[in-house]
């Protein structure tokens, strides 16, 4: 249960959000960009992450969105890619076996049609995935995405 002052505060905050959603979103984005820029200048390690599975946040796709936002916030595409590869391996203490492509390392790979270090949006141009020794070509990936896509179209909004 909320105290009366907490309820009043949340009523005011939610009213502001409902009245000015675009202004609030713009302000949050400005703050996020400033945080990323400050952390980058200070050398703070960053890891990409998402809130999947949450409504409207889809595993895989939400990570690609995150990488694009990190670049929009000032990271280079290479730095953004490291937030989803090497940084998590380091954080988990797996840097010796994961996080980069090298002989003897464990690796599931995403093969792209274009260089993501030139344009981070190229992470969406997936040609194939090597997963646990299996090769999944574009047609295989599209077939795997059919059931969730159909379910999403049936979900009421």
PLM regions: where:
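Active-site neighborhoods of metal-dependent hydrolases
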Residues: 1-73, 139, 146-148, 153-157
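Acidic, glycine-enriched loop/beta-strand segments at the rims
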Residues: 58, 76-81, 90-126
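Alpha-helical transmembrane segments of multi-pass membrane proteins
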Residues: 84-85
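Short, charged, surface-exposed secondary-structure boundary motifs
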Residues: 121, 139-141
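Short aromatic-centered micro-motifs
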Residues: 129
């Amino acid at each position: 249960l909320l105290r009366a002052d907490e309820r009043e505060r949340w009523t005011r905050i939610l009213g502001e959000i409902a009245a000015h959603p675009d202004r609030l979103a713009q302000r949050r984005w400005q703050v996020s960009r400033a945080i990323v820029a400050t952390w980058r200048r200070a050398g703070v390690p960053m890891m990409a992450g998402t809130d999947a599975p949450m409504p409207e946040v889809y595993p895989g796709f939400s990570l690609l969105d995150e990488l694009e936002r990190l670049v929009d916030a000032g990271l280079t595409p290479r730095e953004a890619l490291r937030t989803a590869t090497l940084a998590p391996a380091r954080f988990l203490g797996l840097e010796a076996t994961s996080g980069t492509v090298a002989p003897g390392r464990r690796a599931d790979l995403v093969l792209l049609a274009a260089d993501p270090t030139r344009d981070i949006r190229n992470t969406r141009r997936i040609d194939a995935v090597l997963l646990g020794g299996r090769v999944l070509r574009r047609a295989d990936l599209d077939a795997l995405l059919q059931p969730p896509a159909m379910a999403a179209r049936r979900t009421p909004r």
